[in-house]
Amino acid sequence: MTRRRRRPNYFGLTLLGLILLFGYYFNQIYLPAQPNPFVPTPTPTRSPESFVTEAQALFAEGKLLPAIEAYRSAIAASPQDSTLYVALARVQVFAGQYAEAEKNAKNAILLNPNNALAHGVLAWALNFQDGKNAEAQASIQEALRLDPNNALIHAYNVEILINSGFDGVQKAIDESRVALALDPNIVETHRARALLLEATTNYEEAIAEYQAAIQINPNLADLYIGLGLNYRVLQVYDEAIAAFTRANALNPANPFPDLYISRTYAAIGEFAKSLQYAETAVQDRPDDPTLRGNLGVMYYRNNYWPEAIQQLGYAIYGGVTEDGVKIEGIPLVNDFRVAEYYYTYGLALARTNQCGEALQIAQLLQTRVPADENAQFGASEINRICAENLQGQD
């Protein structure tokens, strides 16, 4: 018997082919094009130029610490670019981070020894650090050799020459004119000229230069501090306080605007306000013996003698506060402000009848700073008060 052959199932074969074709498409084409939900989505990398633009905008707004962070991000994106280290160091000088500025300027020089501005900013940063004026002079000369027509470098040289003493003043005068002639549209050339005029007691002209610098960038606290100091010398106290207050608003972490406001209020006899700002300055930088000394003086002016003794003791002898802050004392040298801490301390001791130590302070003042009239008067007052105390005990 012959079997009948079954016809092929064309529909089933077609369906199977379609299934196989779909499976191939799904595995080989569709799936590879889809994002893996278990793999992090890649983040677009920012260019160093975008960080630089951000940093420049922040600097123009006076936001120095955020500007510093933006420049650091630019360096992380392009660590071989020496100009980024220079830009960072420049902002760090304005922010008072002198050691960090020195480090970054040196990093720039390592990357490019012929970067003139790197040598200039290095000199500028060194100039603010005690005992480094000779290094600053060497660095600024190298900067001038590499680029003798750079206005910023000439401006930095003005500041270094001022710190070099009287012999550098005439050269500083010439340099300030060169800097302004090369570029009158940057802050540093006007700032350098203002510092020179201040150093030569031309305070009204110095004020004009600070104001010119502020016109270029109205958001740098340092400029308002300089402006206020010159107003204070001229006894224009309301303008001085206004300038210091603006500096404080721009950089509230800086204790010096508070310090200068404190001293300005003291100069016009408003001792309660002077004490308030002296306390704020110490809160900003509790390990600074100068700020402790000023606070002690203001306590004394307000007749808080025990508190004055405590704070002036920290300024003179150093020590550790109740909060665990370590302070290094200031030795008595020929400086009117340091002498003020010592004779005010002696007076507070005398007024609380602690004459054993008070008389030692008076003798120290008479020996160490004989030409300081205020210190000598203070020593005489200490002796007088202690003599009266002794008579009262008889």
Summary of predicted features, one role per range:
Residues 1-46, 138-141, 145-156, 184:
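Long, contiguous interaction/recruitment modules in multidomain scaffold/adaptor proteins
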Residues 44-83, 87-97, 128, 156, ...:
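Alpha-helical segment of the N-proximal tetratricopeptide repeat
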Residues 62-69, 95-107, 128-142, 164-178, ...:
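Structural signature of tandem alpha-helical TPR/SEL1-like repeats
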Residues 77, 111, 146, 182, ...:
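Structural marker of alpha-solenoid helical repeat scaffolds
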